[in-house]
Design a protein with these regions (language model features):
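C-terminal motif of bacterial Sec signal peptides marking the signal peptidase cleavage site
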Residues: 16-17
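Beta-propeller domains with acidic blade repeats across secreted/periplasmic ectodomains
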Residues: 22-446, 465-468, 894, 968-970, ...
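C-terminal capping alpha-helices of c-type cytochrome domains
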Residues: 59, 139-140, 148, 191, ...
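Sequence context surrounding c-type heme c attachment/ligation sites in exported
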Residues: 397, 404, 873-887, 894-917, ...
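C-type cytochrome heme c attachment motif
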Residues: 423, 495, 880-894, 901-921, ...
């Protein structure tokens, strides 16, 4: 879920026989429910709100099943479930472990009342512990469980796995929610699946490295693929393709009849950037920097103004836009509903589980240019029960919707809470019986009927039957192709395209009046290797032209550049989907495409379109044109950052001469242009001349008091700017800028200036400088703080502040404790130092300090969470407690520091009990992306924090308090995972019981 962000811990439940207790879905309790009553299966539906016109019934629940992670529904209407009892046990060592392993369950309704009558164990073993995906294809079941993908086969029809085979292996993310997800059967007869950014790499069943058709390694190595990926392959795993990449945790890909791919992707916790994606084949979706692999928070030219958009590098050329951004959340399973039992608003649309918001919803789309827009329509949501956590959705053969509910108090990290619960719901029109008859597949006509079914498993059987029949099924498929339903027509076309005369059907479909059929035909032609020349370059539909561009990806056809140019000439300057399709189509052939395009007349109707194509291009021929755009006097150079950013996507040997040339311009705002050029240039490439020094000095004035000023001073080692740096610090800019400026000042030899101010009469200035040193936290600043603490010449308040600021970082805590341990701490600082060290987030230092200063409270115990929940908290006081204990690392609204996960909507995501658990036991639920790492540097210093970004040359580490430090990899002696959460253990005991209750009350009130 958002990782999945389920918290499980399940008591062993043994179902020895196939019979299961039929769930009772009718509550017998009148009036409001107690907490205990609300958890009972018979009250499950009472806590939910269903879309008008639909009815939700409880199909199955505990004890028959527990913690469903993924679900599929077979052609008989049976529900298959992967469970996760053995979930993240290494992170939760106190929880029981089922030695027999986790289970695959089959649930069946025998009498059509919409409630499961039997629960069978299909397979149980530790090799599928906490599996994240299941796909039922006839007598074969594909199960996704990193590091493997298994195919289980029931050879004798007894609903037991008789054979286990590997499909893929070597996938990262063992016991991780960002790992391999569910497979699905596509309308083209291929398998589609994805993994999140813990998947990392994939090997074939024999352990061999897999490369794409171009010979490129399929792995998160930036050659070219990064982070999470979508894949397509044959049923036997051969011909693996990367369909798109650079996602964070793309959870489950859904494929419609036309071959369109849809999925969700979640953000780094708390950044309100969850997204829904429409997939352009071979697209880059921007989670990390395409070239360097740097994270989204790393500063770059033309950085997006808001974090939700910055999160996906949406201002960068080469990043496909998002269909929809839905704020915070924990997205899980998705399906395209191609049935007609549900109301029209849900038909042919994505349906999706969002446990972070306790909702199942659809995203109805409308075509717009080369892409889509989307809205949100809820189907099923929590009304009173915040434990409702939909982990997957599926469509039954009768068209009803099934929802798997993980059922847990929280979604966040790898912590687990509930021991034995899990539910399956059925959503259908009120009074709708659940009657399913297995498909009859004796004839082609039978199979065509089954091919129309909304259930994927049924369609797989139909597709396989028709495909195996070959030409003998042609007549029935042609009849289906001429039906009035575009999705039936598309399914028929896919099969017709695979016949010996399939090229004829494809070429006919390319001229069809329905643009979706034309798009399907393009995809079928690409798979079949059918060429069609310039047939589509003047197609009236921008969506068809978009697909024609995507089909040009790595094409070797002689007329491809000319056709690409004609399609480029029709770009309107507004449609980002179309622009990115142009970029994908020209990939590996930019020089020829760009040359062909430049030979065409300029786009007088949409002149901005030509500028965008230059910006998106990846050929040296575009660089002089980029420079010309920057130098146009009618352009506001303040808006030229997007053009300067484009230089980052070229090798320095190509971009440097053009950037140096920009320094010689005569624009009315030339200093600003020069400033941006200096930002983009490599310092070693700059001629060291007096003229260049003057240009650089003038450029600095453009960025005075801004981060870019410090960047330039540090980049070019400008010691003559130390006074200005000092003044920047004293102007009290934002936290990160102030620490960065202080670090840069000392790097540039500015320590004498700092000491002079500390010894001066301006007390306010001295206090500001000490705060800045604490934010910097590098060795020179810590040494300066230590010297200040020990020197009684300085006034006591300043030295107290120095002690507090030394105790803000990993090494700083050690330095301060060392003064205590070695009896070097002046006695008048004992009280403040005790306060700092006994509240330290560095565990080893805190333990020593508490034992030294407060031995009586070492074993202070809190009452059980159940008792804390019964105490009423005070929200206003909880806000004050947050400011005292939490705001140095967390944001809540506009208050606090952006270090740990933002808590602005935490009350929508976690129940009170889950919030208590997260505070009391932080090690049990570390959010993905916030895992700590301990770095030992070659100079002897140490750094602890989480990795915000990483490139081939350096690692950007965020330390407690929100300060960042960039570590050159060549300066790192060792790196190892930190075994604890960066959130300090014992925080709950550092405050009073009532303060803890008030804090939780406040956090629980923070909702969307």
């Amino acid at each position: 879920m958002k990782h999945i962000y389920w918290f499980i811990l399940l008591l062993p439940v043994v179902i020895g026989a196939c019979q299961a207790n039929k769930p009772t879905s009718t509550s017998t309790v009148e009036g409001p429910l107690t907490e205990a009553q609300q958890r009972l299966p018979e009250n499950a539906v009472r806590g939910l709100k269903t879309r008008e016109g639909l009815e939700t019934t409880l199909f199955a629940s505990e004890p028959a099943i527990m913690n469903p992670t993924n679900m599929d529904i077979d052609e008989k209407g049976r529900v298959w479930i992967t469970e996760a009892y053995n979930y993240r046990n290494e992170l939760n060592p106190g929880h029981p472990y089922k030695q027999a392993g986790d289970r695959i369950m089959i649930l069946e309704d025998l009498d059509g009342d919409g409630k499961s009558d039997t629960a069978k164990v299909f397979y149980q073993d530790t090799c599928i512990n906490a599996a994240l995906g299941i796909c039922v294809l006839g007598n074969k079941v594909i199960v996704s469980c990193s590091p493997n993908v298994f195919i289980f086969t029931d050879t004798d029809g007894d609903d037991k796995a008789d054979k286990k085979e590997l499909l893929f292996r070597g996938i990262g993310g063992i016991q991780h929610d960002h790992a391999i997800h569910a497979f699905t059967f596509g309308p083209d007869g291929k398998l589609y699946f994805n993994f999140g950014n813990a998947g990392d790499s994939i090997l074939d069943r024999n352990g061999n490295v897999i490369k794409d058709a171009e010979g490129r390694l399929i792995a998160n190595k930036g050659m070219p693929y990064r982070q999470g990926m979508i894949f397509r392959c044959n049923l036997d795993g051969s011909d693996l393709e990367v369909m798109a990449h650079n996602f964070r945790n793309n959870y489950e890909v859904a494929v419609d009849a036309f071959g369109n791919m849809w999925q969700s992707d979640n953000d780094d916790d708390g950044n309100r950037a969850v997204r829904i994606n429409y997939i352009l084949e071979h697209g880059n979706y921007g989670y990390t920097d395409e070239v360097t692999g740097a994270g989204w928070s790393s500063r770059r030219m033309n950085m997006e103004d808001s974090i939700p958009y910055r999160h996906w590098h949406l201002n960068d050329p080469g990043v496909v836009p998002n269909l929809l951004q839905t704020g915070a959340g924990s997205p899980t399973g998705m399906v395209v509903y191609e049935g007609d039992l549900l109301p029209p608003v849900f038909r042919n649309q994505m349906i999706h589980g969002e446990p972070g918001h306790n909702v199942v919803r659809a995203y109805p789309v409308k075509k717009q240019g080369g892409g889509y827009t989307a809205a949100i329509e809820n189907i099923l949501e929590s009304s009173t029960d915040q434990w409702f956590r939909p982990s997957d959705v599926g469509v039954a053969p009768d068209g009803s919707l099934f929802v798997a509910d993980w059922y847990d108090p929280g979604v966040g990290g790898h912590q687990v809470a509930d021991l034995d619960r899990g539910r399956i719901f059925r959503v259908a029109p009120a009074g709708s019986k659940y009657k399913v008859s297995p498909p009859v597949l004796n004839t082609a006509a039978d199979a065509v009927t089954a091919l129309k079914n909304p259930n994927l498993s049924t369609r797989y059987l139909a597709w396989t039957k028709l495909h195996n029949m070959g030409a003998s099924a042609e007549k029935e498929l042609v009849n289906l192709y001429h039906s009035n339903n575009p999705r039936y027509r598309a399914r028929a076309l896919w099969l017709l395209s695979k016949l010996p005369n399939g090229a004829d059907y494809i070429k006919t479909a390319l001229r069809d009046k329905d643009e979706d059929i034309r798009i399907t035909a393009i995809r079928a032609a690409t798979e079949a290797g059918v060429t069609y020349g310039n047939m589509l370059v003047t197609d009236p539909s921008p969506a068809v032209r978009r697909q024609a561009l995507l089909a040009m990806y790595h094409s070797h056809e002689a007329d491809m550049p000319a056709n690409w140019a004609l399609l480029a000439a029709q770009y309107d300057g507004k449609d980002r989907w179309y622009l990115e399709a142009l970029g994908i189509g020209a990939d590996s052939n930019w020089a020829a495409c760009f040359d062909a395009w430049r030979k065409l007349p300029p786009n007088k109707q949409h002149p901005e379109a030509d500028n965008d194509i230059i910006w998106r291009a990846r050929t040296p021929a575009a660089l002089p044109l980029l420079a010309a755009l920057i130098q146009r006097e009618e352009n506001d150079p303040m808006q030229n950052k997007r053009y300067f950013r484009a230089f980052d996507f070229y090798p320095a040997k190509e971009s440097t001469p053009v950037l140096l040339g920009l320094l010689k311009g005569h624009h009315p705002k030339q200093d600003y242009i020069n400033a941006l050029a200096f930002m983009q240039l490599d310092a070693g490439a700059l001629p060291r001349t007096g003229e260049m020094a003057k240009l650089l000095h003038n450029a600095l004035q453009v960025f005075k008091d801004r981060t870019e000023f410090i960047d330039l001073v540090r980049k070019y080692k400008l010691r003559d700017q130390n006074e200005t740096l000092l003044q920047t610090i004293l102007n009290k800019p934002a936290n990160e800028i102030q620490g960065y400026a202080m670090k840069t000042l000392l790097e540039c030899g500015g320590q004498p200036l700092v000491v002079k101010r500390l010894q001066g009469k301006d007390t306010a200035a001295a206090f500001i400088l000490v705060e800045a040193m604490g934010k910097a936290q590098d060795r020179p600043n810590r040494e300066l703080l230590t010297a200040l603490i020990r020197n009684k010449v300085y006034p006591a308040p300043l030295r107290e502040l120095a002690a507090r600021n030394l105790g803000r970082g990993w090494d700083g805590y050690a330095d301060l404790w060392s003064l205590v341990e070695r009896k070097l701490l002046p006695a008048d600082l004992d009280t403040v130092t005790k306060d700092v060290l006994t509240h330290a987030w560095r565990q080893d230092v805190k333990a020593k300090a508490v034992a030294y200063y407060e031995p009586a409270v070492v074993n202070k115990a809190l009452p059980p969470v159940e008792k804390l929940l019964a105490i009423k908290g005070d929200i206003p006081n909880g806000k004050k407690v947050f400011a005292s204990y939490c705001s140095s690392c967390h944001l809540a609204g506009n208050t606090g520091v952006n270090f740990g996960p933002a808590l602005s909507e935490i009350g929508s995501k976690l129940t009170k009990s889950a919030i208590y658990e997260a505070i009391i036991h932080p090690d049990a639920g570390i959010s993905f992306g916030f895992e700590g790492y301990f770095f030992q540097l070659k100079d002897g210093s140490q750094v602890l924090g989480y990795i915000a970004s990483q490139t081939d040359e350096e690692i950007d580490v965020r330390m407690a308090g929100g300060q960042g430090v960039k570590l050159r990899k060549t300066n790192i002696a060792s790196r190892k995972a930190y075994e604890h959460s960066l959130m300090p253990t014992g925080l709950a005991t550092a405050m009073s019981q009532q303060e803890l209750v008030d804090l939780v009350e406040y956090l629980a009130s923070l909702k969307k």
